[in-house]
Amino acid sequence: MTWSRRQFLTGVGVLAAVSGTAGRVVAKTLNINGVRYGMVHDESLCIGCTACMDACRKVNKVPEGVSRLTIIRSEPQGEFPDVKYRFFRKSCQHCDRAPCVDVCPTGASFRDAASGIVDVNPDLCVGCQYCIAACPYRVRFIHPVTKTADKCDFCRKTHLQAGKLPACVEACPTKALTFGNLDDPNSEISQLLCQKPTYRYKLALGTKPKLYRVPFKYGEVSQ
């Protein structure tokens, strides 16, 4: 059973943009029912076209020189002429136990209780880079214009607020990305996690990442 547009819009609720209020306070103004968003990247379907990267940059107005999302191509796997490449998504994992949140001295880095999305309040960020140093996935950066920490937010303040799926999900031509509510057993993402083997990167660190991956069938899975 797939997640209908009505269910998705209900889950999105009133995802409001952060505007001069502490992240922990803003979280209380969002959908009171609460959801826990996650994503699956199917490495067996990803062709490395980088359409997701282009869509992310355009929708979220990410300047050149930095990126919220990167697709990394592996070394060739297999023997000629049967050569394959594995494509690995590098982006925020939206951890339930996010080190970046724990080290932030101003509360600018926060996990939204209503959606499970880890985000940054630019009005509180002082650019100290503690969160960048603490993130074991190396997916945060200082925005060259705002001089504050930035990263993937699942398009929380753009597409999600408008009732759409994240830009990367909408742009993927092979449907390698699935997004939805992990706490809804009937959602498309929950059904997928029941049907396919998945792994999570650096799971042993105890961060409880919410970016799942269907492994590429050649070679070993990176942990």
Residue ranges and their predicted role:
Residues M1-A16:
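N-terminal secretory signal peptides and thylakoid transit peptides that target proteins
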Residues G20-A55, A204-V214, Y218-Q223:
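C-terminal segment of N-terminal export signals and the immediately downstream linker at the start
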Residues R24-T29, A51-R73, R97-L124, Y130-K147, ...:
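Iron-sulfur cluster-binding cysteine motifs and their immediate structural context
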Residues G34, F87, V145-D150, G206:
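Short, solvent-exposed loop/turn segments at the edges of secondary structure
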Residues Y37-M39, E43-L45, V83-R86, Q93-C95, ...:
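Short, flexible, mixed-charge glycine/proline-rich loop motifs
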Residues T70-V101:
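Mid-chain, structured segments of secreted extracytoplasmic proteins
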Residues D153:
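Cys/His-clustered metal-coordination modules, chiefly Zn-binding fingers
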Residues A167-Q223:
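Long, compositionally biased charged/polar accessory segments in the mid-to-C-terminal portions
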